[in-house]
Amino acid sequence: MDPMESSSEQDIVEESQKLVDSLDKLRVSAASSSSNFKKKPIIIIVVGMAGSGKTSFLHRLVCHTFDSKSHGYVVNLDPAVMSLPFGANIDIRDTVKYKEVMKQYNLGPNGGILTSLNLFATKFDEVVSVIEKRADQLDYVLVDTPGQIEIFTWSASGAIITEAFASTFPTVVTYVVDTPRSSSPITFMSNMLYACSILYKTRLPLVLAFNKTDVADHKFALEWMEDFEVFQAAIQSDNSYTATLANSLSLSLYEFYRNIRSVGVSAISGAGMDGFFKAIEASAEEYMETYKADLDMRKADKERLEEERKKHEMEKLRKDMESSQGGTVVLNTGLKDRDATEKMMLEEDDEDFQVEDEEDSDDAIDEDDEDDETKHYYL
Ligand SMILES: Nc1nc2c(ncn2[C@@H]2O[C@H](COP(=O)(O)OP(=O)(O)OP(=O)(O)O)[C@@H](O)[C@H]2O)c(=O)[nH]1
């Protein structure tokens, strides 16, 4: 059954291969779209631990943009969410049926969400072009992500989606923290380490949104971030191994704390929204000054490496041709049916010049139902 259409049965291996190919293609198109870069809208990707209040927070952002007469666009990337308190302009659930994916691929809930996101990522260039068409009328694009944070932050599709956004618009990641639950220094440290890893993985500006401030003030967190001695004093009474580790990490994270923006918000009461949008605007400016330049540099590096690789391959091919002195070179890697290969070479002898690369060669062999891997260079 095609999970994108929920129709007839198909081969799972074939589907997976197609998926990998599409992801590769998308990676290339994301990398090459820098020429279309737009300064507006700002993409706000909302991530956070399960239950931290991402969806409620996004709902609050939608209400705030509406009230302040700015134009928002909402993208939902959580295929497993039952109902959303806001209307999403683009919803993964309209394209991928999460339960069908679970059934077809015989997966559990997390595998189902991950595969749904992978399938959706293969179409993400279309999502970006829809937003590009409306770019002039939009101020913000608000992106909700799956409840299980790692499904988005540590998956290939999450990286592809983030990269596709970041190469076309200024993009800011918002990490939602459950403030009441982070009042324990060890939980706080786990959250900060996660936020830090997201910052280094995405290489995008990050805003820490301490949510649920209607229940617990986030002042303690700001104090811990500003002065590691206050944090160490809070953890002093705990002699466990985790506490000692958190203690030493507080020093290491000092640089991270200095470079990110933190705001206290409440998705329920709406407190802190102005401060949050100020942090987003400042981060978007920072994106243009620092992150965009870095992104362009990384892209140029990637292109240079690809160019070098091509040159190296051509040089290798030229040397092979020279050493064969006009004859036929057969690169044999585990040949089983020698006669069949010789026959194949003779049949194709008419060609003036023909080079089969490794991929083509593999295809041909697959088609003929042979498992030999043979490369021929005809001169
Ligand atoms: N008091 C209070 N509760 C909140 C706030 N934000 C969210 N909640 C509650 O926290 C719970 C989880 O909120 P969600 O918005 O579903 O959190 P989520 O991160 O989207 O959850 P998953 O996507 O399922 O992981 C709900 O019961 C919300 O009502 C807040 O600012 N204050």
UniProtKB/Swiss-Prot annotation:
Expressed in individual cells of roots, leaves and flowers. Residues 303-379 are annotated as: Disordered. InterPro entries: Gpn (IPR004130), Gpn1/Npa3/XAB1 (IPR030230), P-loop_NTPase (IPR027417). GTP binds at G51, S52, G53, K54, T55, S56, N211, K212, T213, D214, A267. GO terms for biological process: cell division; embryo development ending in seed dormancy. Keywords: Acetylation, Coiled coil, Cytoplasm, Cytoskeleton, GTP-binding, Hydrolase, Nucleotide-binding, Nucleus. It is an enzyme of class 3 (hydrolase). Belongs to the GPN-loop GTPase family. This is GPN-loop GTPase QQT2. The lineage of its organism: Eukaryota, Viridiplantae, Streptophyta, Embryophyta, Tracheophyta. The gene is QQT2.
